[in-house]
Amino acid sequence: MNLETIIGLEVHVELKTNSKIFSASPTEFGAEPNTQTSVIDLGYPGVLPTLNKEAVNFAMKAAMALNCEIATETKFDRKNYFYPDNPKAYQISQFDKPIGENGWIEIEVDGKKKRIGITRLHLEEDAGKSTHTADGSLVDYNRQGMPLIEIVSEPDMRTPEEAYAYLEKLKSIIQYTGVSDCKMEEGSLRCDANISLRPVGQEKFGTKAELKNLNSFTYVQKGLEHEQVRQEKELLSGGIIQQETRRYDEATKKTILMRVKEGSDDYRYFPEPDLVELYIDDEWKEAVRASIPELPDARKARYVAEIGLPAYDAHVLTLTKEMSDFFEATVADGADAKLTSNWLMGEVLAYLNKQQKELKDVALTPAGLSKMVQLIEKGTISSKIAKKVFNELIEKGGDPEEIVKAKGLVQISDEGTLRKVVTEILDNNGQSIEDFKNGKDRAIGFLVGQIMKATKGQANPPLVNKILLEEINKR
């Protein structure tokens, strides 16, 4: 029996508003526990929620960027459940009238494009955060009442790789809109995954398992890969799959049962009596639509069509708005686009990944990178020397020209000076000359290396190659 994998994702994104969705409490990350709460957040008797209009604007903006249809009439509902991090014993969410429906995004895996449907996008409030220790459990209510959007995909993904690509694309689009920073490490983006298997050709879905506590996109992919294997073994051996909630354990690289899954009826949804229905007219919709900036796909297409970048470069540069904006500012300052792209995708990304930092955390500026790239273009420094300048720029900042002067890194491009060095190297390496003349091309690389060593890497490489061949041919 051949089985087909069915995957759907539920993504919660914390909106970057200045206050919470139903109260004036601040939303700053990292504050002392229970210092950013109010009687509204904690559900004191007699208090009433007030809807944050900016949260609605942000939700609409995200929904539009995800190609959703925006509701004209929407409302809020109570999702009833008791848990220590939910002091009201209900969560204000949206049940049957979400703010956005029927959206989609396009992903690409192994060179093949695929459209993934988005069932709905709705607004809701976040719960508090529980911390469990050996001595007991603690609850921080700072997160209680934070504005969230939940984005529910269609079950259109067929592999864990497609799920990973969907999350990357979704995160990129949301970051471009500016409604959230989507930092998983700070909890502003969280993902639950639903996975089931069914015989190929069968229309009815199999029984699904929901995966929670997925702390990175990599964990989402790994958790789905393991669950895919687990369910396949169970079904092929004649067993059945229970509808349950599981978590991915990185230590064992397995999914572990948490609880038998509840259905939506268990939450006893009913309309929120303290909030009126919300009417969104065309004027409001168009005002929000006008605020949506250029999104990653459009920017990627522009980089290829107008700037002339290869498709791969355009893809990498537009994955995050931070990198894309940095690239644009560098090129606008006069740097060559392709050379800038090479540095950003090479040295810059390598440094950021190694140091686990973002561009905003380092001293490198678009103006600094632009000036360094222009020094390479003019032949003032070589690419090899530029790496020394780059290390200084990204660690300490400064003016590339001043760094070059202070460290004596100006490229040697005087033909007379280089010819003397080349002649001396050839005089001491007669065997390498013979090897080259006998067809051993590697000998030329050795000689170039000796010349670069003698000039401390400051010789102009193209000029060195030219003079070297001229001098060898004289002998």
Curated annotation (Swiss-Prot):
It is an enzyme of class 6 (ligase). Its EC number is 6.3.5.-. InterPro entries: Asn/Gln-tRNA_amidoTrfase_suB/E (IPR017959), Asn/Gln-tRNA_Trfase_suB/E_cat (IPR006075), Asn/Gln_amidotransferase (IPR018027), Asn/Gln_tRNA_amidoTrase-B-like (IPR003789), GatB (IPR004413), GatB_C_1 (IPR042114), GatB_Yqey_C_2 (IPR023168), Gln-tRNA_amidoTrfase_suB_CS (IPR017958). It catalyses: L-glutamyl-tRNA(Gln) + L-glutamine + ATP + H2O = L-glutaminyl-tRNA(Gln) + L-glutamate + ADP + phosphate + H(+); L-aspartyl-tRNA(Asn) + L-glutamine + ATP + H2O = L-asparaginyl-tRNA(Asn) + L-glutamate + ADP + phosphate + 2 H(+). GO terms for biological process: glutaminyl-tRNAGln biosynthesis via transamidation; translation. Allows the formation of correctly charged Asn-tRNA(Asn) or Gln-tRNA(Gln) through the transamidation of misacylated Asp-tRNA(Asn) or Glu-tRNA(Gln) in organisms which lack either or both of asparaginyl-tRNA or glutaminyl-tRNA synthetases. The reaction takes place in the presence of glutamine and ATP through an activated phospho-Asp-tRNA(Asn) or phospho-Glu-tRNA(Gln). Belongs to the GatB/GatE family. GatB subfamily. This is Aspartyl/glutamyl-tRNA(Asn/Gln) amidotransferase subunit B. It comes from Bacillus cereus (strain G9842). The gene is gatB.
